[in-house]
Amino acid sequence: MAGIGFELKKLFRRKGLFASLRAYGYAGIICTGPMLLGVALQMGILLLCGWVGAERAQQDLLVCMITYTLLFSLTVTSFFSMPVTRYLADMLYEEREQAILPSFWGSSSLMLVLGCSLYGLFLLVSGATLLQGLLCLWLFAEMIVNWNGMSYLPAIKDYRGILCSFLAAIGLAFGLGLVLVVLLGFPVPEGMLFAVAMGYGLMMVWDVVLLYRYFPQSDESPWPFLKWVDEFLPLAFTGLCTNIGLFAHLVICWVGPVGVQVKGLFYGAPYYDVPALIAFLTILITSINFVVSVEVNFYPKYRDYYSLFNDGGVVGDIVTAEEEMLAVLNRELRFTALKQLFVTAAVLSLEGTLLDLLPLGFNDLMHGYFRTLCVGYGLYAVGNTILMILLYFTDYRGAVTAAAVFAVSASGFTALSMAFNTAFYGFGFLIGAALFYLVTLLRLDAFTANLPYRVLGQQPIVAETRAGRFTRLGLFLETKSAARAKHAAGEEREDE
């Protein structure tokens, strides 16, 4: 990702307002991808439904179905995304580009089988109609591929193509939704679900075409990436726990006093969900800043420091390089925190005026949730930036510990807040995010206090290869694929 930041930095150096807007647009899509699309579509759908006068029950059902699909797909992909990203980085470093496309389809197919099976079972008993269930499952499958694709797309550095796919998806979803619901009179849930699925589908096809233009096709096995899941299992749990901490408070509020049963097993908390969605957008600045500023300025010092260990640098040079690297890191993290603080303060100052202009029905309780969650998401954003730095230093144990603290504390304190007045519900996530920030900060400070020992003394003397369940699953799938290919080749020879 530091390489992506260097490329984006070139765009930021160009003068002019439009050049800066384009650079921030590219960075935003690279950093947030389908999640930003999901939030934008959610807000757009609410505005469109309000404009056409749709019933509140239909709006709530539509929002619930899209939100459930988003969160379920995020949960499935969050476990595999970091190991897959590590596999991609290793293949690029080893110049084995021919292994990348097979791993994309292998990881996508594995997540599709797992996710569609579980989500399909939920939809069967959820109370959704057959058409609604099929549309949700279709949208879920597209989101799985899109989420997985965002691990691969930054490597191609075709920012214009990625941005065009994003804008085309939004345009198609809104345009088709307008035609189906307003002009043709389709029911709101089914019509808008179909429109959103078509938008995500266009983005999926567009992004896959971009990948095929850049990476070579090959007949290599699609399953070696599973060895990386075993090898870097803490990365998998780091992604999963971070996802749980980020979204568990929404699910808990759905079944709490502010939650409502929309239909069957579809629950929602409109007074809480809408402020949470808008507050989530405030972390965009920190996400972009991490790629185009923190990594870009930190990475050269980081590379120089570790190259001294690899190339036989003297002790004096290593000490000097370490001091320079940590000074840059501290400066960039401080600037990141200040930028997020400024954005959060500005949003809190203006939210009363701006949100009342939108036809979202904000009341005093929703304004309170929004302010609380803005602070919580701001703390999460800075904590997540520090977490990424821990991963830079390969402190996987510290990263997974911090992520687990975030998941447990955000979920636990949110559940505990259900016993208090509804005005305090957002504070559970706020406390969890604050603990996440503190744990990551303290861990980074402790880890970098004795960095040479971490680099040299904690490395294993003998290299070990972990062959766990995922490795065995990969070998099993490779055996089955080889047997199937051999059988197909035998049938072809018989036909000849």
Regions flagged by a language model, labelled:
Residues 1-41, 60, 64, 226-235, ...:
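N-terminal membrane topogenesis motif
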